[in-house]
Amino acid sequence: MSRASLEKDPREVATMFDAVGKNYDITNTVLSFGQDRLWRKRTRRRLDLAPGDKVLDLAAGTGVSTEELAESGAYCVAADFSLGMLRAGSHRDVPMICADGLNLPFADNTFDAVTISYGLRNLVDFRAGLREMARVTKPGGKLAIAEFSTPVIPGFATVYKEYLMRALPAVAKVVSSNPESYVYLAESIRAWPDQEELAREIRANGWENVGWQNLTGGIVALHSGTKPLD
């Protein structure tokens, strides 16, 4: 797998995340200066879930995002391709399943909402992933995608890119069990579509009413949409 490329070997991606599962959550909190907690809350609020809703949290990792979603009273399922990540989150009180985001083990029109946080970028074919998420979502159901994006504050983008390519890998060497994975993280973020381009891709792959909210100056963009009724 070329680190700077969006072409990925799914086995390599799974192996990479298996290796970081144990310290994944605390590492992300350190590297994001605690902003990851805010981003999870914003995702839950955007979905506006109700008790009894069925929700799929795709690329859920250790399930920390699924726990946040479940605070709404909805029934939330954590799905991830990495067994290592799921094992690291096995203490969480949410149902977990090992699943391929391009071939989900669920019937059509199963969920009231589907969400994926910082995982769409890691799918071998993210467009196919968007269509697969639409398949398992009920007509009129909701989508939320939290993903690293392009800063919108003038001058900040340069500082952020410097952090991504220099500071983040250096800090990861101290706090992560697999710092190489954070080099991949930095390079994949740089290669990822910006907010408007990703919105176009979401619309073209099964979703409507697509919009986004920039979080922390656009470091993260929270895209949302709905599945058409027909």
UniProtKB/Swiss-Prot annotation:
One of its GO terms (molecular function) is demethylmenaquinone methyltransferase activity. Keywords: Menaquinone biosynthesis, Methyltransferase, S-adenosyl-L-methionine, Transferase. S-adenosyl-L-methionine binds at T62, D80, D100, G101, S117. Signal peptide: none annotated. Its EC number is 2.1.1.163. NCBIfam families: MenG_MenH_UbiE, PRK00216.1-2. This is Demethylmenaquinone methyltransferase.
